[in-house]
């Protein structure tokens, strides 16, 4: 009877549920047939409406609707796909299959038929096997339910032995393999793609899931938990690529351009999966090498991209490539084909260089690291999780990923964050998105749709919630974001807007490079940086069309070195640009990237760098949660880490240069050495003392024997120009120029030389570039010596090198600048460096035989002719200031005869001489400050304040002298003191008067300079020392007028009027100093106590004792006076006793003070300006 009831019940249930799609027992019909001994007393599953409201559902098949839906007039629906249930209580494998043999046979036959049909379909479409949902080498097992869903096979992420897929000759044997071996693989730690509207399988139902096939015993535990060297896995790459098709964003190959290796990122990764990998900490190697190692790690098998999202990135990328092709010198738009070959350089890619073993610089600091202030945990579990992540996900393409991104004509640089980058951490942020969607969204959409669009920043969270207001959603989601950030399995970096970020001094932090496109970097450099100081000693056309056209494909060691060098040259240039960008109040240099959600409606922000609407809220939150000291330490920590990373990476490649010096192209050598110039420029730009970078730069320059090019006779640049446009063969059979044709195929492979450590003899027409680079390094050496008082490292004189190596013909391919007026501005900054080099080489402290008042008339005469024929610039005026300062020191120190021990008589002529020198010095200081205030008071790159384009007719050599002819007049007009009845001074200061001098000086408007902070320090030091001298001289003149005749009285009155004007200028200088803020990263206190100026006196008491009745205090605090007195006494015996001191007169007290000021000015020159 029971059997009869069971049969009747089963038949009725199967009849009832056979054609019903909304029945709750439809998903488990086969299993219910074997267990339905008694009828259910309640609904086995709540309808979607009751589940949403979280109320009890009493749905019954007889009614077809539950009471709640009937009351509300709704219809019961069961559209939501449920998750698989776990095993029941007391579940064991031995008793887990109470099914009948008939049902099992039925299911097995149905699954095999399904497999045969799919296998035939895949065999007919082998060309598109990488895009199919089920791989052809997948053997399904018995499904657990009749409505089982197809998940991507887990074995997609497990490399095969030798990359050969298993055969399917005997599927029955494979289906009967023991599935217990699968338990050895911790498959729940392997990420896989979740298809939308599909359920997850439980752990215990793995062997009944069709998404997992049984494995051969030889394939077990072949998943690499640690990234291996490309060399050890090289054999798996060739066979793997032969059988699998690459599904990525790779395009046709191209030639020309530069920095192509960055565009090769994502060649092997899925088009959607690699977007979330931007926050992964990876080895700081070129993406070209990472792609190769990734393909080897995965055994050459393609990864299955999520459906419905594959065609959009490819079409989007093709659109971007068409936009990038507008620039002839951009190789970002031309991806190279994948080459499976990898050489020994890959060992450096996977394991790092030998010099990096045990290095302080962390490998986590890489171009793929996020632009956030992060906290790197040293927990071994976290490290293991980072190493176990599959390497197929690549860094998204850089700045041009967002429509180019509609680059505005008014701004050449646009930081464009990819929307895919904002969707990073797809595996870890799904919970956050789901929670936010359920809390803030009013729609009933499945929240699993957001799992592939997870965002990591509050600004991006705001953009992902259309159902709520921006302010409210931003606030709520930031709270949820912060609450989830401490989970140990989350590898994403913590945003700087979070309140619980670690202390900056104890973390390894860096910025994410690649946010600015290559085109924008080059354009920004030549518009805002090159005119101020030529880091790259070459014009833009030759750089982009010749020098950067190098092969970076992994054909050999040399080409991989090329890729590595260009990568870190580019990163260093981007670091400079981002540090130099004008920041908002309270902003940071890495805030240009973090939390940026690009929106076309953000037109109210500054051109070039578009920020999200929540940017101000984030800044306010950060200011409220961190004090000023912590913010300063954070910025400094990130900057130092980024600078050290660039420096460490570029130094690591030097052993490869020494080993392959003969094969490395001179183009790469120029780029490599320019990177060191770039890093020294960054240090000078922010005013940071890091002598290690300069010292290592000098060492590497000496390794290349560049000093020989300056010391020994070499053909000048006029002899180098002929081979630029045509091939030249000399009559004496010398083929130095023809053996190495620029831009030819042999550029990457040079003939061997007898001296491997010296520059090759076949690069004579590149020698001018190496000479320029050596001169630039000597300039930075001199600048650091002047600023910090250290000894000069390069003692080779560069006097006259500006005219010899930089001011060449404009038509030459190797010219420095193609515009005549811009070239003159560049040469002025170089002449300033040349002067500082001569001053440091002739220091008194470094030359014991020299007297205090050493003569620099040769340098003055050399500079005077040059200064008078050039447009007005800050570098020109500062040269005049340095020369005037040394002349003033000589004048003051000559007032005291050290041998006789007496002061000179302060006559009217001597007083007039001192007053003229002092007034000229103060006038030049005011001119320097006013010009800085008008051109670029913050020394920042501001796209709303661009340099003007030079006149169209200026490049002609014939019109150059005529344009320069009026510059001395303009210089004289601007040099006139503003208080001497010159009403046009303030018009020129505000830019209202446009004469020749103003137009020429405006060519440097918006230009940044590495000398800005050093100039401001020196100007402040001189002003502090001489600001009270006019008052003292006026008092002396007023006292002396009673004993002078009428003619002398009139002359004294003129001097008093002139000194009164200087006092007025000192007041203006004090006010202008407060408006000039060129400081970046590091704050410089100009009014802090300076030992070299006051000998340990505090800033509050300095002014009180500056003019005492006796000058003993200042004289004793002079370091140089003490040093020279010791040298004098050690060389000579004391002669007669000193004369008895007389009652000091006013003139003698003033003379003592003047001499003391002279010694203090000498201390400033010898001991450093900072």
Curated annotation (Swiss-Prot):
Residues 47-76 bind DNA. Its main location: nucleus. The keyword Cytoplasm applies. GO terms for molecular function: DNA binding; DNA-binding transcription activator activity, RNA polymerase II-specific; DNA-binding transcription repressor activity, RNA polymerase II-specific; RNA polymerase II cis-regulatory region sequence-specific DNA binding; zinc ion binding. One of its GO terms (cellular component) is nucleus. Residues 1-22, 139-149, 411-422, 445-457, 493-506 have a biased composition (Polar residues). Residues 99-108, 271-280 have a biased composition (Basic and acidic residues). The gene is RGT1. The keyword Phosphoprotein applies. The modification Phosphoserine is found at residues 202, 205, 208, 229, 283-284, 410, 414, 1130. PANTHER family: GLUCOSE TRANSPORT TRANSCRIPTION REGULATOR RGT1-RELATED (PTHR31668:SF26), GLUCOSE TRANSPORT TRANSCRIPTION REGULATOR RGT1-RELATED-RELATED (PTHR31668). Residues 1-46, 77-149, 226-254, 269-288, 293-323, 384-506, 944-977 are annotated as: Disordered. This is Glucose transport transcription regulator RGT1. InterPro entries: Carb_Metab_Trans_Reg, Zn2-C6_fun-type_DNA-bd_sf, Zn2Cys6_DnaBD. Keywords: Activator, Cytoplasm, DNA-binding, Metal-binding, Nucleus, Phosphoprotein, Repressor, Transcription, Transcription regulation, Zinc. Belongs to the EDS1/RGT1 family. Residues 473-488 have a biased composition (Basic residues). GO terms for biological process: glucose metabolic process; negative regulation of transcription by RNA polymerase II; positive regulation of transcription by RNA polymerase II. It comes from the Eukaryota. It is found in: Nucleus; Cytoplasm. Present with 195 molecules/cell in log phase SD medium. It comes from Saccharomyces cerevisiae (strain ATCC 204508 / S288c). Glucose-induced phosphorylation regulates the DNA-binding activity. Hyperphosphorylation in cells growing on high levels of glucose does prevents DNA-binding and dephosphorylation restores DNA-binding ability. Residues 113-138, 239-250, 293-302, 309-323, 385-397, 424-444 have a biased composition (Low complexity). Glucose-responsive transcription factor that regulates expression of several glucose transporter (HXT) genes in response to glucose. In the absence of glucose, it functions as a transcriptional repressor, whereas high concentrations of glucose cause it to function as a transcriptional activator. In cells growing on low levels of glucose, has a neutral role, neither repressing nor activating transcription. Binds the consensus binding site sequence 5'-CGGANNA-3', of which multiple copies are present in all HXT promoters regulated by RGT1.
